[in-house]
Regions:
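Conserved sequence/active-site signature of Rossmann-fold short-chain dehydrogenase/reductase
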Residues: 29, 36-38, 79, 103
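C-terminal substrate-binding subdomain of Rossmann-fold SDR/epimerase-dehydratase oxidoreductases
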Residues: 55-175
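Catalytic helix-loop patch of NAD(P)-dependent Rossmann-fold dehydrogenases
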Residues: 1-30, 35, 43
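Amphipathic alpha-helical segments in well-structured domains
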Residues: 44, 48-49
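Residues that scaffold the ATP/ADP-binding catalytic core of kinase and kinase-like folds
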Residues: 39-40, 156
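Hydrophobic alpha-helix immediately C-terminal to the catalytic Tyr-X-X-X-Lys motif of short-chain
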Residues: 12, 16, 20, 51, ...
């Protein structure tokens, strides 16, 4: 599973960094940003990025499943602010999740926000790769590792300023 391999490689890299820092007396702080909204490359293959690109191209917003996966998001300026908080106030050897408590949504909710953020575009949310034409049954999945707890970064004074809807609008404009 590619997602599992990615997660394991990140944990390994964090462990190596902390061990190296302890051995050589270095100051290491770890940032774990959630998906960061901002300008998106047209070739970006991440699920949420494809929705932004579709809206930027005035195309239907397509979901290839029921949209139940839940993610944390943060706008780029808030992510940069969190990184500065970590650099200036974070504790060496600690890892900090960067996310916005008000931006934990399912992909279905994210798609609807992309649509509602641009009412002038008359975008529609479409479910594809179905044998029938009906919308797939929806049941939000339980919280997954894609939703990050940001209590530790908030203890450093981090407070996101950009709403998810504004972050989506800005991302579409910048794409």
């Amino acid at each position: 599973d590619a997602d599992s391999a990615y997660a394991q490689s990140m944990r390994s890299a964090e462990t190596l960094a902390v061990c190296y820092a302890e051995k050589f007396g270095m100051n290491v702080k770890i940032a774990r940003p959630c998906p960061t909204l901002g300008g998106v490359r047209m070739s970006d293959e991440r699920k949420w990025a494809k929705l932004i690109v579709s809206a930027a191209k005035n195309q239907s917003i397509m979901l290839t499943d029921n949209g139940g996966e839940k993610f944390s998001f943060c706008y780029v300026t808030d992510t940069v602010s969190a990184l500065i908080d970590i650099l200036l106030n974070g504790k060496s050897g600690e890892a900090y999740n960067i996310s916005n408590d008000n931006a934990n949504v399912t992909m279905r909710e994210f798609a609807q926000l992309v649509k509602s953020a641009n009412p002038e575009k008359n975008l529609s949310v479409v479910f594809v790769h179905r044998k029938d034409e009906e919308e797939p049954e929806f049941s939000p999945s339980s919280p997954t590792p894609y939703v990050l707890c940001n209590d530790k970064i908030k203890s450093l004074g981090f407070s996101p300023k950009t709403t998810l809807k504004d972050g989506i609008k800005r991302s579409i404009r910048a794409t």
